């Protein structure tokens, strides 16, 4: 095909020249058929093959085909008709309608085409190198195959030669008839095979111009004769035809081929058939099933204990695999068994998962001890705890500071409740919070709580009494809490007051006052006459300045429950000392295993307030139940968090009580204790008190009364009045109900009277402890004391008909009394213990016989007496024991 170029044609240049496609010389239209009856017309361009003159011997025949009249005139009209078309499109339709965007797009396409051309050239070079290497390898293989073929032919030739020699000898033997026939067959075969060899060199007839190339190729293939292959020593066989792709009709050969017309016609798009889509889906499914699934790494949350089945579910693993790993570690388990967190972590990490350890106590994280920013802190009032021995004047000193009278309100004139008050210093005007603690031995826990929440401890010591046991205990509490001590030597107005003796006694307990060269401040005061009270307040304020007490008032409140009780009209009431933040009405609070919402705040003066800042003692109303004294109080953000914390604490409390009651898996010491207490008598009690602190002190005192033989068994202890349920419980165990500063309601009193249940009321803890001690002493077994009366020696045994055997004895020591206990000793061995049934002297019954006299004795239910035995006479006394 020859391309001609007119002067109007433009070459491909950038950026003004456009990229156009020159039409082929021959064009045709073919209708394509698709599935479901669809079809469309496609313009087909026919390209002629360029043939070189030296390649094929059929080249001289080309002019003869060109001289034929049929195809010659048909070619020029097609060229004349096809040439003006590009000129018209270039002159009138392409260049005049091109926009700047189209020019830019075509320039971009041209640049991309150049890049692709460079890449294709590189790929072609690489492919050429690869083909050269492949041809070299194939050539070596062909040479090796040719060498093998020649060796094989040589071997066959030698075999044929040997056969021919054998046949020649056979012909000579059997005659000339068969040898004559054999050459004829051989010549016939040779003649038949001879024309087959030139057939391989026959050439195909050139394709006429008017016939499609596909049809010409088919005709040429049909005209070729089969090529014959002849091997040495064997008949000629037709060679297999070369493998060629199956020829298709001209129209179907262009089917699916992307041409310019097809690409520009966007409306007619070939669609995938449903069967093709199904095959593709099946193929993708097959590939997906054959590919190995990637293992998912999960974050496994592991609590303190977890069941094997639950662990497997959280890891999305099989429980069998988990048990197999445990077996490798030497542990045999079932899927329902529970394992600890460490073992579960090892299993999860072995299986390639990440572990997140959690504990039930995590609900309390961030509840307390949150560090405050130093820029948000403000000074706060000091908290001062007054401690000392009973009757040393602690409450009287506070009354003098507060200008109030609290002592008269306490039963017996002693403090049995812990109280918190605020006092304003007359000189500085600053407030000081005082906490009063009981002094007697029963309230050790109260004193310990007071020392924990305080900043300064005021140790009150009576000048006339000196250092006492509870004074020493208060010193130990203050040292354990790490708070400074101020010694207040009280009752200096008494004539027998000796302040110097108090200072000297304190040295024995590592409390060195300033007058003795130490750093502990001491002040001589008198609560009764109000002497040096202002100096005491001044020393407290000075110590508070040294401590630099600051806190953040805008944060959620934290505090400590000092006292708790169950009020009949107000419900659970807790006395709380706010330590950090500000407690407001409506806050959701948690203290121990109890929660609630603050309904009211009552100050120490009995006034209702809306908020309480740091170091302020208030009564809090709104708890669900009375908390325990000493519990820490905190404000939480919502009720859900508060419920989580209280549920966890209640669960912990139940577990502790269950473990103490069951005693299972206890230590050896616990087992020995249970053996000791197995035969111990119990005194059942039900204790009800007004406040939690008093109840705690009573229970501690009753526990100390117990011995190895008898102990108090507390069936129930609580805060509040005596109810009918308490009476019902006491009836089942025949228990005594103790009420401390509380009374039974009408129904409970009637039920107790009807069922014969004893209810005892007390206001002073000493009286309660003394009465219970006496009652428990009645359960103790009495002590038996043996008193020796005298000894007698048996001289002779007499048989009396009505009495039986009677021993004639002489009293050698002391006296022998009738009815006394006797012990028969033979050869220094006690053979009988009993009582004297008869004591006679000269046929008369007597009450006693003194030493040196002779008498007759008979034993109760015993007659085996011999001469020479010794009789000991003694008296047994019963002595009642007490705790």
Swiss-Prot record:
Keywords from the UniProt entry: Cytoplasm, GTP-binding, Initiation factor, Nucleotide-binding, Protein biosynthesis
InterPro entries: EF-G-like_DII (IPR053905), EFTu-like_2 (IPR004161), IF2_assoc_dom_bac (IPR013575), IF2_II (IPR044145), IF2_N (IPR006847), P-loop_NTPase (IPR027417), Small_GTP-bd (IPR005225), T_Tr_GTP-bd_dom (IPR000795)
Biased composition (Basic and acidic residues): 113-184
Subcellular location: Cytoplasm
Composition bias type Low complexity, residue spans: 10-22, 77-89, 185-218
Region annotation (G3) ranges: 436-439
Ranges where the record places region G4: 490-493
Region entry G2, spans: 413-417
Region (G5): 526-528
Region called G1, residue ranges: 388-395
Composition bias, Pro residues: 235-244
Domain tr-type G, residue spans: 379-548
Region (Disordered): 1-259
Main location: cytoplasm
Gene Ontology MF terms in the entry: GTP binding; GTPase activity; guanosine tetraphosphate binding; translation initiation factor activity
GO cellular component, one term: cytosol
Binding site for GTP: 388-395, 436-440, 490-493
Signal peptide (from-to): none
Function: One of the essential components for the initiation of protein synthesis. Protects formylmethionyl-tRNA from spontaneous hydrolysis and promotes its binding to the 30S ribosomal subunits. Also involved in the hydrolysis of GTP during the formation of the 70S ribosomal complex.
Family: Belongs to the TRAFAC class translation factor GTPase superfamily. Classic translation factor GTPase family. IF-2 subfamily.
UniProt name for this protein: Translation initiation factor IF-2
Species classification: Bacteria, Pseudomonadati, Pseudomonadota, Alphaproteobacteria, Hyphomicrobiales
């Amino acid at each position: 095909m020859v391309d001609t170029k007119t002067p109007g044609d433009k070459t491909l240049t950038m950026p003004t020249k456009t990229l156009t496609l020159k039409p082929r010389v021959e064009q045709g239209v073919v209708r394509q058929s698709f599935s479901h009856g669809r079809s469309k017309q496609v313009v087909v361009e026919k390209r002629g093959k360029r043939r070189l003159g030296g390649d094929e011997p059929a080249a001289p025949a080309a002019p003869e085909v060109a001289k034929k009249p049929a195809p010659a005139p048909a070619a020029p009209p097609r060229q004349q008709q096809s040439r003006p078309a590009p000129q018209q499109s270039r002159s009138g339709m392409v260049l005049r309608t091109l926009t700047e965007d189209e020019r830019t797009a075509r320039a971009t396409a041209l640049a991309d085409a150049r890049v692709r051309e460079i890449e294709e050239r590189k790929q072609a070079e690489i492919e050429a190198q690869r083909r050269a290497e492949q041809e070299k390898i194939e050539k070596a293989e062909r040479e090796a195959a040719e060498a093998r073929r020649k060796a094989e032919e040589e071997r066959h030739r030698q075999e044929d030669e040997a056969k021919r020699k054998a046949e020649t000898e056979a012909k000579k033997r059997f005659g000339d008839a068969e040898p004559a026939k054999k050459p004829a067959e051989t010549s016939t075969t040779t003649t038949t095979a001879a024309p087959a060899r030139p057939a391989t060199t026959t050439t195909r007839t050139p394709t006429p111009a008017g016939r499609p190339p596909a049809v010409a190729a088919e005709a040429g293939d049909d005209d070729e004769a089969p090529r014959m292959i002849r091997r040495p020593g064997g008949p000629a066989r037709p060679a297999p035809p070369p493998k060629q792709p199956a020829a298709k009709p001209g129209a179907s050969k262009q089917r699916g081929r992307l041409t310019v017309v097809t690409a520009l016609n966007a409306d007619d798009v070939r669609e995938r058939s449903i069967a093709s889509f199904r095959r593709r889906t099946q193929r993708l499914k097959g590939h997906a099933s054959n590919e190995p699934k990637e293992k998912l790494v999960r974050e496994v949350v592991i609590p303190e204990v977890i069941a094997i089945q639950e662990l497997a579910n959280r890891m999305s693993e099989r429980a069998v695999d988990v048990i197999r790993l445990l077996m490798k570690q030497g542990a045999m388990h079932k899927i329902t068994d529970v394992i600890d967190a460490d073992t579960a972590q090892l299993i999860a990490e072995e299986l390639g998962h990440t572990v997140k350890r959690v504990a039930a106590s995590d609900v309390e994280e961030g509840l307390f001890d949150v560090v405050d920013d130093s820029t948000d802190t403000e000074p706060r009032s000091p908290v001062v705890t007054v401690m000392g021995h009973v009757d040393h004047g602690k409450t009287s000193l506070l009354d003098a500071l507060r200008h109030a009278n609290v002592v008269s309100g306490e039963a017996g004139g002693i403090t049995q409740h812990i109280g918190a008050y605020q006092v304003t210093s007359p000189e500085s005007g600053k407030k000081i919070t005082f906490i009063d603690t009981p002094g007697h031995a029963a309230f050790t826990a109260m004193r310990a709580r007071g020392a924990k929440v305080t900043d300064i401890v005021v140790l009150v010591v009576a000048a006339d009494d000196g250092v006492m046991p509870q004074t020493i205990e208060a010193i130990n509490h203050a040292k354990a809490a790490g708070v400074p001590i101020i010694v207040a030597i009280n009752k200096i107005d008494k004539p027998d007051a000796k302040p110097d003796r108090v200072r000297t006694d304190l040295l024995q307990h590592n409390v060195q006052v300033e007058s003795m060269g130490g750093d502990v401040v001491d002040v001589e005061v008198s609560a009764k006459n109000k002497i040096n009270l202002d100096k005491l307040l001044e020393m407290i304020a000075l110590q508070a300045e040294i401590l630099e007490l600051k806190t953040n008032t805008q944060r959620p409140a934290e505090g400590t429950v000092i006292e708790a009780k169950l009020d009949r009209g107000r419900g659970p009431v807790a006395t709380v000392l706010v330590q950090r933040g500000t407690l407001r009405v409506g806050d959701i609070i948690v203290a121990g295993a109890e929660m609630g919402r603050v309904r009211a705040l009552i100050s120490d003066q009995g006034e209702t307030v809306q908020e309480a800042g740091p170091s302020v003692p208030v009564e809090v109303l709104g708890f669900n139940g009375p908390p325990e004294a000493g519990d820490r109080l905190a404000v939480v953000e919502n009720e859900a968090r508060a419920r989580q914390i209280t549920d966890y604490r209640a669960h912990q409390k139940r577990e502790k009580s269950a473990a103490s009651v069951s005693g299972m898996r206890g230590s050896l010491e616990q087992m020995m204790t249970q053996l000791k207490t197995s035969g111990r008598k119990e005194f059942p009690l039900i204790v009800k008190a007004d406040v939690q602190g008093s109840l705690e002190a009573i229970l501690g005192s009753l526990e100390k009364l117990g011995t190895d033989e008898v102990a108090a068994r507390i069936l129930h202890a609580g805060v509040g009045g005596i109810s009918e349920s308490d009476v019902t419980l006491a009836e089942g165990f025949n228990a005594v109900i103790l009420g401390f500063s509380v009374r039974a309601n009408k129904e409970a009193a009637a039920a107790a009277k009807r069922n014969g249940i004893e209810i005892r009321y007390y206001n002073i803890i000493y009286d309660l402890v003394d009465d219970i001690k006496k009652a428990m002493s009645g359960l103790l077994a009495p002590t038996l004391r043996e008193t020796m009366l005298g000894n007698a020696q048996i001289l002779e045994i007499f048989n009396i008909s009505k009495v039986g055997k009677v021993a004639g004895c002489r009293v050698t020591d002391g006296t022998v009394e009738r009815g006394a206990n006797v012990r028969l000793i033979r050869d220094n061995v006690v053979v009988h213990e009993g009582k004297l049934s008869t004591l006679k002297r000269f046929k008369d019954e007597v009450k006693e016989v003194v030493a040196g006299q002779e008498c007759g004795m008979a034993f109760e239910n015993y007659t085996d007496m011999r001469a020479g035995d010794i009789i000991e006479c003694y008296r047994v006394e019963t002595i009642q024991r007490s705790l």
